[in-house]
Amino acid sequence: MKPLRHSSLALYLGLALTLAASIVPRLAAQDAPPVVGEWSGTLNPGGQPKKHVVVHISAEQDGSLRGTIDYPDQDVSGVQITTITYRKSALHFESTPALCAYDGTLDKDNSRLTGVWKQGGTTLDLILRRTQ
């Protein structure tokens, strides 16, 4: 067996790194819970103007979830979600700054959350649809 030349070694090393770089993001994406993404819905508090809500959920490297809430109609964005859990298609989150909570169930194709939004003593049905 002939020893590898420096150029051959560099070529093999480059190919190995390219392959690893293409596989690792796919593996990370597979591990992310299906609720990770951007979700949008409309609160309809009967007799009051409708309020659009956008929820952003991301996964940390340790597997924990983080999120923020935007209220586009009020020009408010980035309200922190302080507690968020996802288990067996059930999502629960709470936002202390917004004084709200949401409990929803993810549908089978991972495109819609159907649930209940609670805020300020009011409970409203809220469907969140995946936008990203």
Please report, for each region that a protein language model flagged, where it lies by residue.
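N-terminal secretory signal peptides that target proteins for export/translocation
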Residues: 1-7
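General helical secondary-structure elements
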Residues: 1, 22, 125-126
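Boundary at the C-terminal end of the N-terminal hydrophobic targeting segment
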Residues: 21, 27-31
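Bacterial N-terminal signal peptides
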Residues: 10-22
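Central antiparallel beta-sheet cores of small beta-barrel/beta-sandwich binding domains
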Residues: 30-130
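Compositionally biased, intrinsically disordered low-complexity segments enriched
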Residues: 7-8, 14, 54, 121
